[in-house]
């Protein structure tokens, strides 16, 4: 069982996009029973709020629903619950480390690193470009899936 937690600042744009894109990839491969996939925020700013309309709209364009998702915050105990804690950018990693304190098992990484790329997933909250964010999230999620399953 692979347990993956995607993390961004507010859990309304990038990390829920990654959560639901990864769930879609896994479901289409017939492997949903082999994965636990979730997302959360490092901040408290959006806790309880639904996914941003731009993310919701982009996911709907590709046939993915995220209707019931609400923002939640990362907790220190999440470190023990998940095998992979996947951040969208370096600031997320700094804030993850502030919450979990240490990463002795090497669980924390950047999403794009799983696609053999360096850099961050741009935050569409600031850029307004949900298409570019989706493209990069999809690349990262496909890379992570291949890395874990060999498919």
Q: What residue spans do the PLM features occupy?
A:
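Conserved active-site segments centered on acidic
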Residues: 1-81, 146-150
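Phosphate-binding/catalytic loops
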Residues: 78, 84, 90-151
């Amino acid at each position: 069982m692979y347990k993956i937690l995607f993390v961004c600042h507010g859990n309304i744009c990038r990390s829920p996009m990654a959560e639901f894109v990864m769930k879609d990839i896994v479901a289409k491969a017939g492997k949903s029973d082999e994965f636990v996939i979730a997302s959360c925020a490092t901040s408290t700013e959006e806790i309880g709020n639904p996914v941003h309309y731009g993310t919701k709209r982009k996911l709907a364009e590709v046939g993915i629903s995220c209707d019931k998702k609400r923002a939640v915050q990362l907790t220190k105990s999440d470190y023990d619950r998940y095998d992979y804690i996947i951040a969208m950018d370096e600031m997320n990693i700094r804030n993850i480390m502030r919450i979990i304190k240490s990463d002795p098992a090497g669980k924390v990484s950047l999403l794009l690193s799983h696609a053999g790329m360096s850099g961050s997933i741009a935050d569409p909250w600031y850029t307004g470009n949900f298409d570019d964010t989706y493209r990069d999230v999809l690349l990262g999620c496909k890379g992570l899936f291949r890395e874990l399953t060999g498919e």
